[in-house]
Amino acid sequence: MNILDELGRRILFFDGGLGSLLQERGLEPGELPETWNLTRPEILIDIHKEYINAGADIINANTFGANRFKFDNLEEIITAGIANAKKAVAETGKKAYVALDIGSCGKLLKPMGTLDFADAVDVFAEIVRIGDKAGADLILIETMSDTYELKAAVLAAKEN
């Protein structure tokens, strides 16, 4: 059953915070959490499994801050984040969906900043294409205070 069918049948529960749990497990101030997709995958897998075992139906991959402005190896970072979450699902033997988690790109859009709307759409489209290729079941766009940036992310998700 796909997620849209399941949403029509019942309430689905997301996991909880990831960053605070990574800090509890050693993430240093200023360290980018997404790097742990490659360097500390076992910790991410354990956290995802804890959420699944607690009843989460949707697990957010550790991709919230992953974009071309922060990572030269973006595809590797996102692919590993999705793979870690999928591995956690498989190891529990339970049904859960994996969300590509998209946060702000970290740049201000014009006129307040320097990023053009079309460029913002392109930044988010790249993330979406990588997440889709890696096997994400859905996209979660969160924690954006600029509605123009949110519009760029939604447009990228719809078109890709």
Residue ranges with predicted function:
Residues M1-N160:
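Domain-level signal for soluble alpha/beta catalytic cores
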